[in-house]
Amino acid sequence: MEDKTNVMRILDQKKISYTAHTYDSSKAISGTEVAAYLNQNPDRVFKTLVTVAKSGKNYVFVIPVEAELDLKKAAKAVGEKSIDMLKSKDLLPLTGYIHGGCSPIGMKKLFPTTFQKEAEEYNTIMFSAGKIGYQVEMNIKDLAKVIPYKTADITIDNI
């Protein structure tokens, strides 16, 4: 791989094993399309969402690409009354990442991070490497060496 993202450099520095994946990002591509392009089960490919609580605090939630964040469950998981999605225009100044290239690793500031609980069921999961067109695949337990996180049921149940 010719380019390493900041996420990959952080993982290298901490000597954490990961596999880098790339995809053609020249056209708009959804998380579900990324999973298909990389021939991965979309349940194992995660997206990073940044929220703001009524208290003004920011929280990061990482959920499967086909799932939808349940704002009530997410708020409860972090002990807040309510949360909303961060506005797209606020993402880059707050995190250093753009929409579609946001990673739970390497944000400008460390925010409380919660993964959908099923993330622990897989040997490895994939998420953005901090740049559109780049993904990292790693064991979620190794992630604790980089960022503190917890898991909870934070997605809308599809019945």
PLM regions and their residue ranges:
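Extended, low-hydrophobicity, polar/charged segments
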Residues: 1-159
